[in-house]
């Protein structure tokens, strides 16, 4: 299918079908709105393009998924955060889950009937993910999971979790499971962050019983799964977030009375550089390339562009961030984490230096 024609048809459909969010801007309202948008797009087949037929999709280029995300997020119909979970976890299920499980579960995610979360980081294992300690112990046809995760986005609203556990020492001792969040022994505690939103959670697993058929891949495949998952965070997910940042740039220009051309130019240049890089990444993914450590470049560029944009907004909208309880304040505070979440910028630069430039460890 021609991407330009697809985008034009989608835009026409969105113009004719009102999916405008309501006045409630709480996190819970954002989650409900995301489900509403996904359901409408899935019922009209838009959400199914770019996904394999065996997982409930309609096939076609992967690029079509990026187009849908760009239009939905760029128009402000849904927030980029919940959308990113879909674009990260659905490919993971398709690649690692038993085919019958993927065929059953992926349509639930695409259609907005369910939201899933990603149980990776722990109190002592963030960027150093390989040190995770949540343990899974075999018990007949089940596995018993005990441990704690943290910074788990949207866990309080999630039906399932893609969970990394420790089954043996080292990288080869990490195993992934697909866990129902209503399983006895799971406790979710939302964390209030400085921007006032309970997006992140602590999740406790106290002798949680998970059937062996819910393992993703084989024992020890968890590290490979994580390495395959992270590039998806930096491909289609980033494309949506870029659309969101461009919409904020447009809003900044509309709201300011004194334009600082130099500051705006620098912010725009950072966004444009990011978009050009991400566009190349989209085309590589669409062409079947297996993304790797080079997506760390995309991650560094995104963090730089996001913080530059909201730093510019702070300078051009005096008091909007410091004195007013506005969305600019919330977004500025959230942007401070752009160099931390998904792997810190320091870690990304180390990856670029060691794995792309072969500069060694010193």
Where are these regions (language model features)?
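A structural signal for short hydrophobic beta-strand segments in well-ordered beta-sheet cores
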Residues: 134-137
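Amphipathic, small/basic residue-rich leader segments at the start of a protein or domain
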Residues: 1-82, 104, 108, 257-265, ...
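Glycine-rich beta->alpha junctions and the first turn(s) of the following alpha-helix
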Residues: 186-275, 338
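Glycine-rich phosphate/cofactor-binding loops in nucleotide/flavin-utilizing enzymes
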Residues: 63, 67-68, 227-228, 232, ...
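A short core secondary-structure module
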Residues: 142, 146-188
């Amino acid at each position: 299918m021609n991407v330009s024609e697809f985008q034009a048809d989608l835009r026409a459909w969105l113009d004719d079908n009102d999916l405008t969010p309501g006045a409630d801007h709480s996190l819970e309202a954002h989650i409900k709105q995301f489900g509403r948008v996904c359901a409408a797009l899935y019922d009209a087949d838009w959400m199914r393009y770019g996904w394999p037929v065996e997982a409930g999709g309609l096939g076609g280029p992967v690029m079509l998924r990026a187009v849908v995300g760009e239009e939905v997020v760029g128009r402000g119909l849904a927030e980029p955060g919940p959308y990113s979970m879909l674009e990260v976890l659905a490919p993971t299920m398709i690649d690692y889950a038993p085919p019958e499980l993927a065929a059953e579960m992926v349509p639930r995610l695409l259609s907005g009937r369910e939201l899933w979360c990603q149980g990776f980081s722990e109190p002592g294992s963030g960027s150093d993910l390989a040190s995770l300690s949540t343990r899974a112990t075999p018990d007949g046809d089940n596995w018993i999971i005990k441990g704690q995760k943290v910074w788990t986005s949207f866990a309080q609203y999630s039906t399932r979790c893609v969970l990394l556990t420790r089954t043996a020492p080292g990288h080869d001792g990490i195993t992934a499971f697909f866990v129902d969040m209503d399983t006895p022994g799971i406790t979710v505690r939302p964390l209030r962050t400085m921007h006032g939103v309970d997006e992140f959670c602590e999740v406790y697993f106290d002798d949680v019983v998970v059937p062996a058929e819910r393992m993703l891949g084989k024992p020890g495949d968890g590290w490979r799964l994580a390495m395959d998952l992270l590039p998806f965070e930096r491909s289609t997910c980033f494309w949506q977030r870029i659309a969101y940042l461009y919409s904020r740039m447009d809003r900044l220009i509309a709201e300011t009375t004194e334009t600082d051309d130099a500051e705006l130019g620098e912010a725009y240049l950072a966004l444009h550089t990011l978009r050009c890089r991400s566009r190349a990444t989209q085309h590589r993914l669409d062409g079947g390339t297996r993304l790797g450590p080079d997506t760390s470049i995309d991650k560094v560029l995104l963090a730089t562009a996001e913080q530059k944009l909201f730093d510019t907004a702070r300078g051009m909208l005096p008091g909007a961030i410091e004195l007013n309880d506005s969305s600019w304040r919330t977004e500025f505070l959230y942007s401070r984490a752009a160099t931390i979440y998904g792997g810190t910028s320091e870690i990304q630069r180390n990856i670029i230096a060691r794995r792309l430039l072969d500069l060694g460890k010193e």
